Amino acid sequence: ALRETVRISDQVQVMTELAVRNLSSGKWDPGPIEGREAKTDRLTREVVDYLAELRRRTHEQNDATEHLMLVATELENMGDQVRRLYRREQRLKKEGIEFSEQGRAELVATAELVQERMRLAFTALATGDLQMARQVIDGRKPLEEHVARMRLAHLARLEERLLESRASS
């Protein structure tokens, strides 16, 4: 189950890399993202079903299986977020609206920070490196602070009445 969960993380990692690249350019190719998202959904279902069956058969409610189930479903949610970002930008484009230059740059910078943190987390998961896992946990607060600053910057653009900022809220 751990190996399959790592495979899920590999799919999500590539989806995130594609999203950062596409977000940066404003040009999306949905094919690779949708294909990986479908694979992520299938793998997640298989991992969760396997672990649930294992827990039923052994009547064992151990932390390791519970954590793997949570990790797998969170990874699936991350993949869903990439798809939502793509669909959001496509919807805006149909309305003739693009992210503001500053907003796009902030989204890309934030996505790159998240991506780097994901790499660290996925490596910690795959290797069982506790020190690396601690780095991931310790990096949570700085990332949350960065996201809070980006939200405030977005609100400032809303106050400036930028059409792109209002439409992308």
Regions found by a protein language model. Name each.
Residues 1-169:
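Cytosolic, long alpha-helical scaffolding segments
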